[in-house]
């Protein structure tokens, strides 16, 4: 094969690769613009093409939403290339009381969280690591020798009773229950150790997003993860407290900043219980009498396809009082892999920029749906 022919083949391969890359990038772009799921108001005739207007993608003209359940809506590229099916779910219109108040958070893990394994100086002077390769950071110890372990105190108590024989641990590893065996090591002081760093609780402050009429609330807009393992905490229970802002760590490029405050852990400051910790935030039940004392404004909950580029409001407390600050939604992503990254927001309010440097962790974001000053807030997003 002569050089000219090889060169032609090389050029054709490069062109084919370019076309494949362009097609893949185009598919990725459309996939991010068109969501996999939609929620729409029950009993309403909705033009999907109006909700998800895109020149390259076609949908059925309208669907009648009833109480019968969800619909699967096929869509095509250029009218004939199958693209994806959108799950359309009818939901009741809902209003909630949006807040922006600062709250204190205390969580107890379900079992004892393993932060890391560690070395032990044995009585013989040797360095041993009995749990290495058996127990992993992020595991939860649920029981030892068939005795349930609820917290560090129970684990330490049971360790004090060890006699050096092998112990049986029941672990929760990413949702899978695993039985493992570890042989403890007697340290230089004569105590038996497993060589584990553990944690059973965490605390902090954040922003209360909303409360509904039954006292069910959502807060933070992101899950609470362990600072060492970076894993989402599996919680047994938690308590929501009143909190006081003491300082604001200013945000900067690459650093979101944060609100710093004080929590008084006594019954007079309890606002409610924390029942769930997930990627979208923490959820639970609030005492309605306590909720009524907070700064709350009743607002309708919007669907994600109703978000528009343009003016938005950030509702938060950075100096002890809930206020609204101006911002701009710059870009919208209806189908991002991370459900907490639905849009890009730019703070434009000079007062907030002066106080915080921009968005800091723990702020509630809303947007102006009808352009006439009636703000709608996005449930669970901060």
Annotate each language-model stretch with its function.
Residues 93-128, 172, 177-185:
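Signal peptide-directed extracytoplasmic domains
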Residues 185-381:
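Serine endopeptidase catalytic core focused on the charge-relay Asp
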Residues 25-78, 88:
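Beta-strand-enriched, solvent-exposed domains that form extended recognition/catalytic surfaces
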Residues 8-25:
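Hydrophobic membrane-insertion alpha-helices, especially the h-region
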Residues 147-158, 179, 323-326, 373:
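Short, Lys/Arg- and Gly-enriched loop/turn segments at beta-strand edges
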Residues 130-153, 369-371, 382:
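Conserved PDZ fold ligand-binding element
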Residues 68-72, 164-166, 307-309:
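Extracellular Ig-like/FN3 beta-sandwich strand-entry sites
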Residues 77, 86, 90-93, 156-195:
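PDZ-domain C-terminal substructure recognizer with occasional recognition of PDZ-binding tails
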């Amino acid at each position: 094969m002569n050089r000219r022919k090889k060169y032609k083949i090389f050029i054709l391969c490069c062109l084919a690769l370019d076309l494949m890359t362009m097609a893949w990038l185009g598919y990725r772009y459309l996939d991010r613009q068109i969501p996999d799921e939609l929620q729409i108001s029950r009993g309403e005739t909705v033009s999907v093409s109006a909700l998800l207007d895109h020149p390259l993608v076609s949908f059925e003209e309208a669907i009648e939403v009833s109480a019968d359940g969800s619909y699967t809506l096929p869509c095509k590229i250029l009218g004939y290339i199958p693209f994806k099916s959108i799950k359309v779910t009818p939901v009741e219109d809902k209003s909630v009381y949006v807040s922006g108040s600062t709250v204190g958070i205390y969580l107890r893990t379900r079992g004892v969280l393993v932060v890391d394994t560690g070395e032990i100086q044995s009585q013989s002077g040797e360095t041993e690591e009995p749990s290495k390769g058996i127990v992993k950071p992020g595991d939860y110890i649920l029981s030892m020798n068939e005795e349930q372990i609820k917290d560090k105190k129970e684990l330490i108590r049971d360790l004090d009773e060890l006699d050096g024989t092998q112990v049986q641990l029941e672990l929760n590893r990413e949702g899978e229950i695993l039985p493992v065996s570890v042989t403890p090591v007697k340290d230089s002081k004569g105590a038996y150790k497993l060589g584990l760093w553990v944690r059973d609780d965490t605390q902090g402050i954040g922003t209360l997003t909303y409360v509904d009429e039954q006292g069910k609330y959502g807060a933070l807009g992101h899950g609470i993860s362990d600072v060492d393992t970076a894993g989402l905490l599996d919680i047994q229970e938690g308590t929501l407290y009143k909190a006081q802002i003491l300082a604001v760590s200013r945000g900067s490029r690459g650093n979101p900043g944060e609100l710093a405050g004080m929590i008084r852990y006594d019954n007079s400051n309890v606002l409610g219980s924390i029942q769930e910790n997930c990627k979208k935030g923490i959820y639970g039940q609030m005492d309605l009498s306590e909720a009524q004392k907070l700064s709350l404004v009743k607002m309708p909950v919007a669907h994600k396809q109703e978000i528009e580029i343009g003016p938005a409001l950030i509702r938060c407390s950075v100096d002890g009082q809930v206020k609204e600050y101006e911002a701009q939604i710059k870009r919208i992503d209806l189908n991002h892999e991370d459900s907490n990254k639905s849009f890009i927001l730019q703070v434009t309010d000079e007062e907030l920029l002066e106080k915080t440097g921009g968005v800091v962790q723990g702020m509630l974001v809303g947007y102006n749906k009808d352009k006439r000053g009636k703000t709608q807030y996005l449930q669970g997003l901060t």
